[in-house]
């Protein structure tokens, strides 16, 4: 990942500088999330855009027809530059790095939350408040995923901190305690 990160950082940093000047950083961050979601869920899209067989012009034409109405000109220009330079295989890393740089520049903490079932709005608000106090910032972004294997409860990852309030985690800890006792 360090090599991919060193490739992604200049592109992501340039995009952040441009979007800051144009005051569209938040909009582009949301578009990056949407694009990442589409990229991760569409294997045919990934295969086509990373194929060494397709010419850069064909990739740019496809990207323009697919995304020109959904993304800002700044993000569209980045996609075209990546296509021209045969860097579309690094698109995911570039978008993720942009989001990291965006959060860092605005002091936004990212918490990855796995819950056994979807959280109610009230639970999400309480969780957001707790994560804000843990992070020491009022700006938090919560990446919430449902994971039924937790049986009940949730797990929060905030940087290097982990809070495991899941039933499966409690069962695992109980098993470890019993193994130590015997």
Swiss-Prot record:
Keyword annotations of the record: ATP synthesis, CF(1), Hydrogen ion transport, Ion transport, Membrane, Thylakoid, Transport
GO molecular function terms noted in the UniProt entry: proton-transporting ATP synthase activity, rotational mechanism
Family classification: Belongs to the ATPase delta chain family.
Function: F(1)F(0) ATP synthase produces ATP from ADP in the presence of a proton or sodium gradient. F-type ATPases consist of two structural domains, F(1) containing the extramembraneous catalytic core and F(0) containing the membrane proton channel, linked together by a central stalk and a peripheral stalk. During catalysis, ATP synthesis in the catalytic domain of F(1) is coupled via a rotary mechanism of the central stalk subunits to proton translocation.
Gene3D superfamilies: N-terminal domain of the delta subunit of the F1F0-ATP synthase (1.10.520.20)
InterPro entries in the cross-refs: ATP_synth_OSCP/delta_N_sf, ATPase_OSCP/d_CS, ATPase_OSCP/dsu
Subunit annotation: F-type ATPases have 2 components, F(1) - the catalytic core - and F(0) - the membrane proton channel. F(1) has five subunits: alpha(3), beta(3), gamma(1), delta(1), epsilon(1). CF(0) has four main subunits: a(1), b(1), b'(1) and c(10-14). The alpha and beta chains form an alternating ring which encloses part of the gamma chain. F(1) is attached to F(0) by a central stalk formed by the gamma and epsilon chains, while a peripheral stalk is formed by the delta, b and b' chains.
Thylakoid among keywords: yes
Membrane-related topology note: Peripheral membrane protein
SUPFAM superfamilies from the UniProt entry: N-terminal domain of the delta subunit of the F1F0-ATP synthase
PROSITE patterns (alphabetical): ATPASE_DELTA
One annotated Gene Ontology cellular component of this protein: plasma membrane-derived thylakoid membrane
Listed name of the protein: ATP synthase subunit delta
Localisation per UniProt entry: Cellular thylakoid membrane
NCBIfam families: ATP_synt_delta
Gene name of the encoded protein: atpH
Principal location: membrane
